[in-house]
């Protein structure tokens, strides 16, 4: 039976403060729980890409087509809610086209860790409102996949509030090794420009915040169950080397019983996966099925 969802858009996730229009999220909530025990369902949380700087990609247009597919899919009964998080963006560069909405002025001034702080603030807001604990799947595309894995290292940094890590992370066309991204840039000097804008000129920082360089996923993600690495068959921007280096980084973590590291291939180019929605939705659906299989094997 199809699950019916209500869409709430542009919700500020920073309380008692004046939020930027980028510090908002969208939520899709079932109008009623049709599957009984809600403690066995999952929240799906999307993080859009756009090289930390593209105002034409936002929480709504990134997720809305995938959501339409998910609410009519075979796993809709397992979904407790869906969210998509906006975050502040880095400065534009001269080579970047003017966004369709016009000039954004001085509003794009974010630099690491601003993007990450915003994503975590969005997750913490959702946790306070819905209390789903670890029962969520963090799904990021391109730099959104970077941010998804960076939420794990944020736990070890100076933060007054912490959040429960997800049971699963889906990285779609993810950027996992930032120096490697710069070195294999198919459109020089595009990657170098947006990495400078997002992280500054210290390339030691680029390496330190690259998920593929994290040394101990067992310590960073002890409650994790599933890592899904997705690549696009005709990706114009991201080399398969990004997936390969991340798979290698997760190998030891994934050897523990009750965990999986999976790779998926999608047809099409870098942005086609979310623009059509079906690719993004299929990754989530397969991941929910993987998690259910893990639960059965643990029972």
Swiss-Prot record:
Keyword Hydrolase part of the UniProt annotation: yes
EC number: 3.5.1.-
Pathway noted in the entry: Secondary metabolite biosynthesis
Annotated active site: 142
Highest taxon above the source species: Eukaryota
Protein keywords: Hydrolase
GO molecular function: hydrolase activity
Keyword Hydrolase: yes
SUPFAM superfamilies assigned: alpha/beta-Hydrolases
Annotated motif HGGXW, positions: 48-52
Region (Disordered): 90-110
Record function comment: Kynurenine formamidase-like hydrolase; part of the fragmented gene cluster that mediates the biosynthesis of fusarochromene, a tryptophan-derived metabolite closely related to a group of mycotoxins including fusarochromanone. Within the pathway, fscH converts the product of fscD into 4-hydroxykyrunenine. The first step of the pathway is the epimerization of L-tryptophan to D-tryptophan in the presence of the NRPS-like tryptophan epimerase fscC. D-tryptophan is subsequently hydroxylated by the tryptophan 6-hydroxylase fscE to yield 6-hydroxytryptophan.
Family to which this protein belongs: Belongs to the kynurenine formamidase family.
Domain notes: The main chain amide nitrogen atoms of the second glycine and its adjacent residue in the HGGXW motif define the oxyanion hole, and stabilize the oxyanion that forms during the nucleophilic attack by the catalytic serine during substrate cleavage.
Protein name: Kynurenine formamidase-like hydrolase fscH
Protein species of origin: Fusarium equiseti
């Amino acid at each position: 039976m199809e699950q019916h969802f209500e869409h709430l858009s542009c919700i500020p996730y920073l309380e008692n403060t004046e939020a930027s229009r980028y510090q908002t999220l969208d939520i899709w909530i079932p109008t009623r729980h049709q599957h009984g025990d809600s403690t066995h369902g999952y929240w799906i949380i999307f993080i859009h890409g756009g090289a930390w700087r593209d105002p034409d990609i936002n929480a709504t247009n990134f997720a809305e087509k995938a959501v339409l597919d998910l609410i009519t899919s075979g796993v809709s009964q397992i979904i407790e809610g869906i969210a998509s998080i906006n975050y502040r963006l880095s400065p534009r560069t001269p080579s970047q086209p003017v966004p369709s909405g016009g000039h954004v002025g001085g509003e794009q001034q974010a630099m690491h860790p601003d993007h990450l702080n915003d994503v975590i603030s969005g997750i913490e807001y959702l946790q306070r409102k819905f209390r789903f604990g670890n029962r969520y799947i963090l799904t990021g595309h391109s730099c959104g996949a970077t941010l998804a894995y960076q939420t794990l290292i944020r736990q070890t940094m100076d933060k007054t509030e912490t959040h429960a890590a997800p049971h699963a992370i889906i990285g779609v066309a993810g950027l996992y090794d930032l120096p490697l991204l710069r070195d294999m840039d198919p459109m020089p000097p595009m990657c170098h420009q947006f990495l400078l804008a997002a992280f500054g000129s210290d390339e030691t920082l680029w390496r330190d915040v690259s998920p593929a360089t994290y040394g101990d996923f067992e310590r960073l993600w002890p409650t994790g169950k599933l890592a899904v690495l997705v690549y696009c068959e005709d990706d114009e921007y991201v080399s398969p080397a990004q997936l390969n280096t991340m798979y290698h980084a997760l190998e030891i973590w994934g050897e523990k019983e009750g965990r999986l590291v999976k790779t998926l291939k999608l047809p099409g180019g870098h942005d086609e996966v979310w623009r059509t929605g079906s690719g993004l939705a299929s990754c989530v659906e397969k991941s929910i099925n993987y998690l259910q299989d893990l639960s059965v094997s643990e029972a």
